[in-house]
Each structure stands twice: as structure tokens, then as C-alpha cells.
């Protein structure tokens, strides 16, 4: 089964066996972490900054390929989060996928087109990336709740509320199949 590093990669599934293989892969490789919202921070990488310098500055824990893809083809936004593993506080800085931006804004209790817009359109300018990061960081710092963070294929795919129930995909697929057969 393949790792999907790029935000716009699509995996086509043509059979029930391929679906099962994909679900097993997701179950084995997806990681959910719990992180305090007020300890989350958004970083950007400046265009002239070398990847190694960025990794040192931000404390990034992921591959150069994932960083480069996030900068060149993705959001160019990285999330620093804290989690507890075996009683120890661990930190990570990883790329944010497009799919994670809205859920990040939900955790910061902010929203609106100006914050997630990436393309200049007629009559609409794009807010500079660092300004977006500053706004999001100020708002994240206000909330002491915890969030569930989905780490998938070296990127953050979602940041859900602490009450979000993580369900097994296999069980959901089987339930849907059962309903469709009836």
C-alpha cells in the first residue's frame, strides 16, 4: 500500500480486497495524538530558508520531502503540537494538509474565507501567510481544551475536538455494506 505524501494524491480502489488492504494500512499507519490547543502553534517556511535551517528553527521531525512538498505544492503551514507519550511531553512540527486547515480554524474558534483562501480572485486579495499564522496562533492560545490530531503520511490531516470519537473505518464500511444489502 502506498503512502500519500502530496495533498492532491488520489488512491483509486477497484475491489473489496483493495479497500480492505487500504483500511488495514490506514489502521496500522495513522496516528491520533491528543494535544492542548493553547500549546499549538502554526509556522511557515520562508522561501529563502533552507530546509535544514527550518527544521532546526521549528524543531521539525519529518522528512525533507514532506517539508518540500508542503512548501511547493501544499499549504506552507506547519503545526507545532504537544502530546504526552508514556508520561513524557513530546513536541512535533509537521506540515498541515489542506484538509486540516478548516479543522484547525475550528479549534481556534475562528473562520472565514480570508483565513483559508489561497488564490487571488477578482476583488479578493490573499492575506499573507505569516499574517494568517499570527492570527491563528493568537486565537489558539486562548483555548485550554484538548484536540485530537490525525497524523497521516508525515502530515497533519485533521485537528478535531477532544470529544471527537475516532471510529474504526472497517466497522463503518461493514455497517454501510450491511445497510445497502438490506
What do the predicted segments below correspond to?
Residues 178-182:
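Charged low-complexity "KEKE/polyampholyte" interaction tracts
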Residues 2-175:
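Feature for intrinsically disordered/low-complexity regulatory segments and propeptides
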